[in-house]
Each structure stands twice: as structure tokens, then as C-alpha cells.
């Protein structure tokens, strides 16, 4: 199974922590005394200690170069729920978000299915290693206007899924300047923030807001979606985070989050874990070390048989280039090759067309 972006490399560290901290769970003899308090109705905005712990963890995964206000954190059922709530808050049916391609296929579900919002692709290709440019943003924006589609925002994923790359400071400055010029919102999916395993390091959009004082930036237009699914390896816990600099969005998202709450038991356990500074420090360091080692082994093995990947340093996957194996440079040929990999090689990988890539022959392969 190399088609799911799961981080299973550090499960043992979490298991050891739970064994050594049984009082963190209300389902153990050591924690049972708190059962009634936790099992009853709680603040729908989330436990204060959990929001504080998440704010501290978000700062830690960004090198403690910035801080986050716990009162601006809104809980949701995973990043899926967080994205949908954000879309409901920012756009009406028929309005659109620009999204650089290739992008995570789940965005088509998260942002479109129930909201009626459209996604307009921003063209990025291998000629410059899929780097987002001002020209591509302008082209997508103008194309939407020509089609009578009102653009309400830009959605970026940093680090990128499926590319495994990070956006540098120059690109992030371009993004901020663009959304301010167009007066549209910016939604930054940063759920892979702590999966960077080599230099250059991750730069959060929050850092741009703090540091780049020479460019115009209306904070009311900026929103971050985060999760513990990838950085901590907890996709089953369904912990999604919306962090908005816009008071109206925070208030609206809080009301909507009532339909997708994070269980209090989960909050209680994770608050204790994330407040263990020694564990978090050790966990993040070991996670980066293991991701780097797995990345080197996997890409090294591919290189030995002549298969290249896009140069990357983050995420739980590589963007594998199999264009030379296509019978023809078409998506039909890509599908044919994908079926061979699935049915004959017996490996589940994801074809590039599922990420809306415009170039046949690219595949996402998860290695963690």
C-alpha cells in the first residue's frame, strides 16, 4: 500500500509515551477519576488546555519563530472538515478558489461537494519543477473572469501534496502580494509542516505576515488549515484546525464546527501529549530523521533502476517520473501503466491525472 499518505514511521514513539503516561487516558485505571468530567458536555470551542497545546505545537513545528493565539483556533473533524468549513465561510455556491496543480484530489470533495464552490486550476508544470508563478496566477484569475466565475480565494498547500516540495519565501511573498492586489482570500494548507526532513526549511505563511513588512498584507484575508494527521501520524483521531486572522471567519467557523467536533477524550489525551515538551522535541527530531532515511533508501532504489523523482524534501511521498515508460504521452497510456503497477507489480500508487496534473507519466508514491 503506497497510495495512502499515512505516517507510520513514528507510531512506536507514541505507543511508548501512552504506556508511560496512562493517566492521560480516561480509559485506564490511572485516568478513570477524570472520566465523568470528560464524558459530560464540554465547550464546543474545544478544551482550553487542548487549544493552548495545539497553539504551542504549531509554533514548535515552525521553529518557534512565530506564535499562535489559542483563541483563534477552531476545531474540526480532520483537515477535510476544516477545509469545508473554511469554504462555507468564504464563498457562496458558484464562486471559486484558485488551486495550483497538481493538487490533492480530496480538495474536490472537501471544498466542492456540499458547498457548491468551484476550483479553478492554476497551471504549474515540470518546466520549472512545478513552481507557482505570478504569471500562472494571473492567467488563472483572468480565465475565471472570462468564464464569469467570481474568484473568492487562493488555496495553496505548503509543503505540497503530491510534490513533497516547500514554497520558498519569494513564492510566498508573490502569493501574498497577489491576493492583496485582487482582494481575495488565501487559505494555506500546512498539514505537512513538520514532515520537512532536510533543508531548506519550512516557512509558514504566518512568518510572512510577521516578517515581510515591506509588502502590503491584509491579515483578514489569510487563513491556515492544519491537522495532526500527518505530522503526528493521527489520521484516525480526526483533529483538524482552522486558524484565521479574521474575527468574522473565526466566529462563523466556530458555529459551523458544531457539526464536526473533535471528541473530548481525544482532546484530553493529546493535550497531555503535546504539553510534554521533552517528548515533542524528541518526536519531531526522530520523525525527521526517519523520514529522511526512508526517503534516501526509496529514491536511491528507484535511481538504481533509472527512475527519477522530483527533487523534494518534505511530505510522506515522492512525485515519481515514469514518462519514459509510457507507450504514448497520453493519459490513456498513463492509466494503462498504472493498471500494470496495480495488478501485476501489486503496488498501489496514485496516477498523476488524479491530482489534475497536465503532464502524463507522473505518479505519487507514499513511502512512510
Swiss-Prot record:
Pathway the protein takes part in: Alkene biosynthesis; ethylene biosynthesis via S-adenosyl-L-methionine; ethylene from S-adenosyl-L-methionine: step 1/2
Function field: Catalyzes the formation of 1-aminocyclopropane-1-carboxylate, a direct precursor of ethylene in higher plants.
Induction: Hormones, such as auxin, environmental factors, such as mechanical wounding and a number of chemicals.
Alphabetical GO biological process terms: ethylene biosynthetic process; fruit ripening
Cited Pfam families: Aminotran_1_2
Entry-annotated residues carrying N6-(pyridoxal phosphate)lysine: 230
EC assignment: 4.4.1.14
Cofactor: pyridoxal 5'-phosphate
Organism placement in taxonomy: Eukaryota, Viridiplantae, Streptophyta, Embryophyta, Tracheophyta
Keyword annotations from UniProtKB, A to Z: Ethylene biosynthesis, Fruit ripening, Lyase, Pyridoxal phosphate, S-adenosyl-L-methionine
Reactions catalysed: S-adenosyl-L-methionine = 1-aminocyclopropane-1-carboxylate + S-methyl-5'-thioadenosine + H(+)
Name the UniProt record assigns to this protein: 1-aminocyclopropane-1-carboxylate synthase
CDD domains named among the record's database cross-references: AAT_like
UniProt-recorded Gene Ontology molecular function terms: 1-aminocyclopropane-1-carboxylate synthase activity; pyridoxal phosphate binding; transaminase activity
Assembly information from the UniProt record: Homodimer.
Similarity section: Belongs to the class-I pyridoxal-phosphate-dependent aminotransferase family.
Amino acid at each position: 500500500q503506497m497510495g495512502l499518505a499515512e505516517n507510520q514511521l513514528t507510531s512506536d514513539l507514541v505507543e511508548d509515551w501512552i504506556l508511560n503516561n496512562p493517566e492521560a487516558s480516561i480509559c485506564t485505571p490511572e485516568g478513570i477519576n477524570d472520566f465523568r468530567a470528560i464524558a459530560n458536555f464540554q465547550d464546543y470551542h474545544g478544551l482550553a488546555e487542548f487549544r493552548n497545546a495545539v497553539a504551542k505545537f504549531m509554533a514548535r513545528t515552525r521553529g518557534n519563530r512565530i506564535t499562535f493565539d489559542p483563541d483563534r483556533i477552531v476545531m474540526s473533524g480532520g483537515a477535510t472538515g476544516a477545509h469545508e468549513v473554511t469554504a462555507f465561510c468564504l464563498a457562496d455556491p458558484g464562486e471559486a478558489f484558485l488551486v495550483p496543480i497538481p493538487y490533492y484530489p480530496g480538495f474536490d470533495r472537501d471544498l466542492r461537494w456540499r458547498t457548491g464552490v468551484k476550483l479553478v486550476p492554476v497551471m504549474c508544470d515540470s518546466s520549472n519543477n512545478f513552481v507557482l508563478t505570478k504569471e500562472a496566477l494571473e492567467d488563472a484569475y483572468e480565465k475565471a473572469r472570462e468564464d464569469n466565475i467570481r474568484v473568492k480565494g487562493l488555496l495553496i498547500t505548503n509543503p505540497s501534496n503530491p510534490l513533497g516540495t516547500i514554497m520558498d519565501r519569494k513564492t510566498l511573498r508573490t502569493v501574498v502580494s497577489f491576493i492583496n492586489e485582487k482582494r481575495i482570500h488565501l487559505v494555506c494548507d500546512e498539514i505537512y509542516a513538520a514532515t520537512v526532513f532536510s533543508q531548506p526549511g519550512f516557512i509558514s505563511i504566518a512568518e510572512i505576515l510577521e516578517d515581510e513588512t515591506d509588502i502590503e498584507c491584509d491579515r483578514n484575508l489569510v487563513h491556515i488549515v492544519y491537522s495532526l494527521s500527518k505530522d503526528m501520524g493521527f489520521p484516525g483521531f480526526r483533529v483538524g484546525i482552522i486558524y484565521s486572522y479574521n474575527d468574522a471567519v473565526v466566529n462563523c467557523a466556530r458555529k459551523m464546527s458544531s457539526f464536526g467536533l473533535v471528541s473530548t477524550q481525544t482532546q484530553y489525551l493529546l493535550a497531555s501529549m503535546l504539553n510534554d515538551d521533552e517528548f515533542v522535541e524528541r518526536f519531531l527530531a526522530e520523525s525527521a530523521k526517519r523520514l529522511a532515511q526512508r526517503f534516501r533508501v526509496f529514491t536511491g532504489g528507484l535511481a538504481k533502476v533509472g527512475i527519477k523523482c522530483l527533487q523534494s524534501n518534505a511530505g510522506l511521498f515522492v512525485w515519481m517520473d515514469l514518462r519514459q515508460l509510457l507507450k504514448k504521452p497520453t493519459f490513456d497510456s498513463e492509466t494503462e501503466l498504472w493498471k500494470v503497477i496495480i495488478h501485476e507489480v501489486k503496488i498501489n500508487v496514485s496516477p498523476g491525472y488524479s491530482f489534475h496534473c497536465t503532464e502524463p507519466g507522473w505518479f505519487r508514491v507514499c513511502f512512510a
